[in-house]
């Protein structure tokens, strides 16, 4: 079963890559307000056609991502947005933490911590709060495969009191 999931994820990524240069002409903006109204997550999810934008599964995807944004407070959409200065500062902290680790394992430990640091802060790499077996990026790639057209998270915002 796990092997099948891996194959499906690879197929979704390939499908998304093939559609990457298509124009996005439709989409939706969705907001999720957490109980009490103190936290709001909002997203703009774009697609190629109005037909897909009106689809209930597409709307549910956007709402789920908005809920995730409210809950997890991602700092970056993708790794491309992470500043070098942030990585340098994180690496310095992790190197200090790994000072007592033996030389052979130190580099591997630091790289593992950096990967974890990025996974916690980059929205497209975060495990979805309602289904931690897939990331937000994998969910979007699955939507590309399901709908047969390009789907892209254009913008997200988290507001809190």
Task: List where the protein language model places each region.
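N-terminal assembly/interaction segments in proteins that build large macromolecular machines
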Residues: 1-161
